[in-house]
């Protein structure tokens, strides 16, 4: 099973290399927030649960992040996770 942070770095680097600098910056900012919340740059995909996501959202709101920032970071996490599922790196978890 893969590591969310490593995969986010890989995706952000690919975006930067293809000239999508703004999107790459958002991915890196989101990644930094996840690392700050989790306390480590090692986060297995299996630990990215509904409870983890709710706690992360609460953490961001507790840091006085705007709703737009919270929404952007959560969307970014969803996009990265879905990309990992497509590549069979992360498990598909139906809701």
Q: Model-derived features: where do they sit?
A:
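Short, charged hinge/linker segments at domain and secondary-structure junctions
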Residues: 47-50, 83-95
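Basic/aromatic-enriched alpha-helical hairpins
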Residues: 1-63, 82
